[in-house]
């Protein structure tokens, strides 16, 4: 059978096919195989049974094969059969194989003669077969029988096309010799998907059932109706032989005797019969597999790469590894710690571009949300002045004070410091929420183990809650420390002298007018209601104005809105809107923009809204509700202050403002540090060094690594497929590159398959061969049946000769030209006819003057050259 490495290619495909069929991936890989196509009663079952040497396929009238049968023939010293759907059972009785095929077919298709594209996988081991992989497809039928659906013809054709359309499949087109070959549905379907004829092999059956006096010699020699890969003739058992229990091996011997003894086929007997068909198919399949290996390897590598992402944490061990659970637990806990640290600290690899990570969100809390909460408590100007005036008066009592009391300053400062507790504790709560969300995101990879995920989240969350208490205690301690001693000697404190000088300026300190506080996209909800809805603009917020532009290039300014008398109010989110909205309005009831009393600005998230509010606060635009409270307080303090008290209030006001700014600066600096040290860093250390111990102490390993049935099945299938892919790639990589392929035959003119109307009803019937003069096409003159003058050896030129047109039945005739050199090359290497009296051992070549032998039809007819 040639190179041993080439023969091992076909078992390789069988191994790959089983590996992927077991996990439902067989149809996704175009594994090289041979598809057997033919009409009903064309002899497909007999051909397949001759391969195996056993009777095992269902037989009967009508459509019998209703599901594709993937038949893998494997050379083995022992003979048995295996089905993929019941691998544990070996069939040694082939009658049971037939019954199992029928039962498995009925299990899927029912008993109403329906069909199904789901294949039946059957492997047959035998010392009498070559390594072949074939697919037996349902026979082509025209008319439904019994309960078959009306579109049974189209269903079968669709199923056949589904298998033979693959570029990696060879097509075995089976046609009986007693049927019109030009109208063969098998060849037509093969031509439809394989117009070049590279994948089609013709098989002619029932040669022994042709009408007396006719033969298929021209067809088998690939001269009359040529195919690129030619035809192979076989002789199967008749129904009488099958009923008479004629042994297949005996039938193969009878087939061999038929070709050796038949006058029309004996010169090509070595290229006919089931054994030669086996060898030819094995050779063609081996060549095809070798050509398909690069694409197959590429597909396997592509699937392996996509699968590696899913089994990253499991790829180093197999499902049957006894230490798999321990390895998985250790690896998952370690990976959880790495993922948590990356989400908090940030990482350059696998950066999420869709949303902010936990660390980025915590950073926004530290530097945007927390300062925003601090700024909100700084603007209560009227309440602060009222409290200062009350403190001064209460300290003086019945006396009239001449100097500004420093006790009033300390009392007001301590009261302001106490107000820092609320935003500080709120900051801790926000960070805790982000930490818990980060933990849940990192445990998503543990979804295969619900118990492990639940315990991990519980243990880490409990630890975070424990650190929450210590962190809040430490922050309250910091505030108490600030409150315990007022350090008026601080280098940043303005002192009484500077406070009195600054009191004459009436606190006119403002930001730099042209300083840009924030830029970004915002949607104006109510500016284009009459023009089709909201519109997005590029906004620029400075210390004095709010401007918006068409785009971020800031070339086309739409409008500039001064910040004087502007306030912010919250707007309820619309029922059908995903945006978060806040509004800007004028406190003096003036239109803000054109005829609008307020402008509604929308953001994608509440975080963006809070960030924009903090920016407006820095620009001096405050929320509405706080301003309303201030106005209520102002109504209660309509009393007039004397000039001396007013100067004292202003002085203490400036002192308080200066000292509170120092405290705020200190708190803004210490809050992130305290939270990082006591909560975040400790949580990271706990996950790395203590989480595993807590997991082992909370439950045993078996309960932690329990999987749901679906998750376990999916995981095992994924790992099995991953290792099957790696094994397949390793096997393909070991194939010898020195394998020599059999060259593909040259192209032939096979247009006869499409244009069948120009041929006779029985094109394969050949009474006597005819020879045409050189240089003249067959269509110039009618055919002149008769024996050839000189047999010409087989040569490549026989494939390049123009196809001989079909001709009517036999009739006597003579050649117009008897020049032996004028005839084109012929396929046979010996005379086509032997007289009855000449024994089989007569030499195959005779001189031109020798008398020609009569044909089978006219055995007594003398040669014209006598």
UniProtKB/Swiss-Prot annotation:
<keyword id="KW-0206">Cytoskeleton</keyword>
<dbReference type="InterPro" id="IPR001401">
    <property type="entry name" value="Dynamin_GTPase"/>
</dbReference>
<dbReference type="InterPro" id="IPR011993">
    <property type="entry name" value="PH-like_dom_sf"/>
</dbReference>
<dbReference type="GO" id="GO:0045202">
    <property type="term" value="C:synapse"/>
</dbReference>
<feature type="modified residue" description="Phosphothreonine">
    <location>
        <position position="751"/>
    </location>
</feature>
<dbReference type="GO" id="GO:0006909">
    <property type="term" value="P:phagocytosis"/>
</dbReference>
<dbReference type="GO" id="GO:0005525">
    <property type="term" value="F:GTP binding"/>
</dbReference>
<dbReference type="GO" id="GO:0097749">
    <property type="term" value="P:membrane tubulation"/>
</dbReference>
<dbReference type="GO" id="GO:0030136">
    <property type="term" value="C:clathrin-coated vesicle"/>
</dbReference>
<dbReference type="GO" id="GO:0001931">
    <property type="term" value="C:uropod"/>
</dbReference>
<keyword id="KW-0505">Motor protein</keyword>
<dbReference type="GO" id="GO:0005874">
    <property type="term" value="C:microtubule"/>
</dbReference>
<keyword id="KW-0967">Endosome</keyword>
<feature type="modified residue" description="N6-acetyllysine">
    <location>
        <position position="594"/>
    </location>
</feature>
<protein>
    <recommendedName>
        <fullName>Dynamin-2</fullName>
        <ecNumber>3.6.5.5</ecNumber>
    </recommendedName>
</protein>
<keyword id="KW-0007">Acetylation</keyword>
<dbReference type="GO" id="GO:0003924">
    <property type="term" value="F:GTPase activity"/>
</dbReference>
<dbReference type="InterPro" id="IPR030381">
    <property type="entry name" value="G_DYNAMIN_dom"/>
</dbReference>
<keyword id="KW-0771">Synaptosome</keyword>
<feature type="modified residue" description="Phosphotyrosine">
    <location>
        <position position="231"/>
    </location>
</feature>
<feature type="compositionally biased region" description="Pro residues">
    <location>
        <begin position="802"/>
        <end position="811"/>
    </location>
</feature>
<keyword id="KW-0770">Synapse</keyword>
<dbReference type="GO" id="GO:0016185">
    <property type="term" value="P:synaptic vesicle budding from presynaptic endocytic zone membrane"/>
</dbReference>
<keyword id="KW-0378">Hydrolase</keyword>
<feature type="binding site">
    <location>
        <position position="206"/>
    </location>
    <ligand>
        <name>GDP</name>
    </ligand>
</feature>
<dbReference type="GO" id="GO:0043005">
    <property type="term" value="C:neuron projection"/>
</dbReference>
<dbReference type="GO" id="GO:0030054">
    <property type="term" value="C:cell junction"/>
</dbReference>
<keyword id="KW-0966">Cell projection</keyword>
<dbReference type="InterPro" id="IPR045063">
    <property type="entry name" value="Dynamin_N"/>
</dbReference>
<comment type="subunit">
    <text>Oligomerizes into a helical polymer that self-assembles around the vesicle membrane, when associated to the menbrane through lipid binding. Interacts with SHANK1 and SHANK2. Interacts with SNX9. Interacts (via C-terminal proline-rich domain (PRD)) with SNX18 (via SH3 domain); this interaction regulates ATG9A and ATG16L1 trafficking from recycling endosomes to sites of autophagosome formation. Interacts with SNX33 (via SH3 domain). Interacts with MYO1E (via SH3 domain). Interacts with PSTPIP1 (via SH3 domain). Interacts with CTNND2.</text>
</comment>
<feature type="binding site">
    <location>
        <position position="211"/>
    </location>
    <ligand>
        <name>GDP</name>
    </ligand>
</feature>
<dbReference type="GO" id="GO:0001891">
    <property type="term" value="C:phagocytic cup"/>
</dbReference>
<feature type="region of interest" description="G3 motif">
    <location>
        <begin position="136"/>
        <end position="139"/>
    </location>
</feature>
<dbReference type="InterPro" id="IPR022812">
    <property type="entry name" value="Dynamin"/>
</dbReference>
<dbReference type="InterPro" id="IPR003130">
    <property type="entry name" value="GED"/>
</dbReference>
<feature type="compositionally biased region" description="Pro residues">
    <location>
        <begin position="822"/>
        <end position="851"/>
    </location>
</feature>
<dbReference type="Pfam" id="PF01031">
    <property type="entry name" value="Dynamin_M"/>
</dbReference>
<dbReference type="InterPro" id="IPR019762">
    <property type="entry name" value="Dynamin_GTPase_CS"/>
</dbReference>
<dbReference type="GO" id="GO:0048812">
    <property type="term" value="P:neuron projection morphogenesis"/>
</dbReference>
<keyword id="KW-0965">Cell junction</keyword>
<comment type="similarity">
    <text>Belongs to the TRAFAC class dynamin-like GTPase superfamily. Dynamin/Fzo/YdjA family.</text>
</comment>
<feature type="binding site">
    <location>
        <position position="208"/>
    </location>
    <ligand>
        <name>GDP</name>
    </ligand>
</feature>
């Amino acid at each position: 059978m040639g190179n041993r490495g080439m023969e091992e290619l076909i078992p390789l495909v069988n191994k790959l096919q089983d590996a992927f069929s077991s996990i439902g991936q067989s149809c996704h890989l175009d594994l090289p195989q041979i598809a057997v196509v033919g009409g009903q009663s064309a002899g497909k079952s007999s051909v397949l049974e001759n391969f195996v040497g056993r009777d095992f396929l269902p037989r009967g009238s009508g459509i019998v094969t209703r599901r594709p049968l993937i038949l893998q023939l494997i050379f083995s010293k022992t003979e048995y059969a295996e089905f993929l759907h019941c691998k544990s059972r070996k069939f040694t009785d082939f009658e049971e194989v037939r019954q199992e095929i029928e039962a498995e077919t009925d299990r899927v298709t029912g008993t109403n003669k329906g069909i199904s594209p789901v294949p039946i996988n059957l492997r047959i081991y035998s010392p009498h077969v070559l390594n072949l992989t074939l697919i037996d497809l349902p026979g082509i039928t025209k008319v439904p029988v019994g309960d078959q659906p009306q579109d049974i013809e189209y269903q079968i054709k669709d199923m056949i096309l589904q298998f033979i359309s693959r570029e990696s499949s060879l097509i075995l087109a089976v046609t009986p010799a007693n049927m019109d070959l030009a109208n063969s549905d098998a060849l037509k379907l093969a031509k439809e998907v394989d117009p070049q004829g590279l994948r089609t092999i013709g098989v002619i059956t029932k040669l022994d059932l042709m009408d007396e006096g006719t033969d298929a010699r021209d067809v088998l020699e690939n001269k009359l109706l040529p195919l690129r890969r030619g035809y192979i003739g076989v002789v199967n058992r008749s129904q009488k032989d099958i009923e008479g229990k004629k042994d297949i091996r005996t039938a193969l011997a009878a087939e061999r005797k038929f070709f050796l003894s038949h006058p029309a086929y004996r010169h090509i007997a070595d290229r006919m019969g089931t054994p030669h068909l086996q060898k030819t198919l094995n050779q063609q399949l081996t060549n095809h597999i070798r050509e398909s290996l690069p694409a197959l390897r590429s597909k396997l590598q592509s699937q392996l790469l996509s699968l590696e992402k899913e089994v990253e944490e499991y790829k180093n061990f197999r499902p049957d590894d006894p230490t798999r659970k321990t390895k998985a637990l250790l690896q998952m806990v370690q990976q959880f710690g790495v993922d948590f640290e990356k989400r908090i600290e940030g990482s350059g690899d696998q950066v999420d571009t869709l949303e902010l990570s936990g660390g980025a969100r915590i950073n926004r809390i530290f530097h945007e949300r927390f300062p925003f909460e601090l700024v909100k408590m700084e603007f209560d100007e009227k309440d602060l002045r009222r409290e200062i005036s009350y403190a001064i008066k209460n300290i003086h009592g019945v006396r009239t004070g001449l100097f500004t009391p420093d006790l009033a300053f300390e009392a007001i400062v301590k009261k302001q410091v106490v107000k820092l507790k609320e935003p500080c504790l709120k900051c801790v709560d926000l960070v805790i929420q982000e930490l818990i969300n980060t933990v849940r995101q990192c445990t998503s990879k543990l979804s295969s183990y619900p118990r492990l995920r639940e315990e991990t989240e519980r243990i880490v969350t409990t630890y975070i809650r424990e650190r929450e208490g210590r962190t809040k205690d430490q922050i309250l301690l910091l505030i108490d420390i600030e409150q315990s001693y007022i350090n008026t000697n601080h280098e940043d404190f303005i002192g009484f002298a500077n406070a009195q000088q600054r009191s004459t300026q009436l606190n006119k300190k403002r930001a730099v007018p042209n300083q840009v506080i924030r830029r970004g996209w915002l949607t104006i909800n109510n500016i284009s209601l009459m023009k089709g809805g909201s519109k997005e603009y590029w906004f620029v917020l400075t210390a004095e104005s709010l401007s918006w532009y068409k785009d971020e290039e800031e070339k086309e300014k739409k409008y500039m809105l001064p910040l004087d008398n502007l306030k912010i109010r919250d707007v309820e989110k619309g029922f059908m809107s995903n945006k978060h909205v806040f509004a800007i309005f004028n406190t003096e009831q003036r239109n803000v923009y054109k005829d609008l009393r307020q402008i509604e600005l929308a953001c994608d998230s509440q975080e963006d809204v809070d960030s924009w509010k903090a920016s407006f606060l820095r620009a001096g635009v405050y929320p509405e509700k706080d301003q309303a409270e201030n106005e209520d307080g102002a109504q209660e303090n309509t009393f007039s202050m004397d000039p001396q008290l007013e100067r004292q209030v202003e002085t203490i006001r400036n002192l308080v403002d200066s000292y509170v700014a120092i405290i705020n600066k200190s708190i803004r600096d210490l809050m992130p540090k305290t939270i990082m040290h006591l909560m975040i860093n400790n949580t990271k250390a706990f996950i790395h060094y203590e989480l595993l111990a807590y997991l082992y102490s909370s439950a045993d390993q078996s309960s932690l690594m329990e999987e749901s049935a679906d998750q376990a099945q999916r995981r095992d299938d994924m790992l099995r497929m991953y290792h099957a892919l790696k094994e397949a790639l390793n096997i393909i990589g070991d194939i010898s590159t020195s394998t020599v392929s059999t060259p593909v035959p040259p192209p032939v003119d096979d247009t006869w398959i499409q244009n069948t109307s120009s041929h006779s009803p029985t094109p394969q019937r050949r009474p006597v061969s005819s020879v045409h003069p050189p240089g003249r096409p067959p269509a110039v003159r009618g055919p002149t049946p008769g024996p050839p003058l000189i047999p010409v050896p087989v040569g490549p030129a026989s494939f390049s000769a123009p196809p001989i047109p079909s001709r009517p039945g036999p009739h006597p005739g003579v050649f117009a030209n008897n020049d032996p050199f004028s005839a084109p090359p012929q396929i046979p290497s010996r005379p086509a006819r032997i007289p009855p009296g000449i024994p089989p051992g007569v030499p195959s070549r005779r001189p031109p003057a020798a008398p020609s032998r009569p044909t089978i039809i006219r055995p007594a007819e003398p040669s014209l050259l006598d």
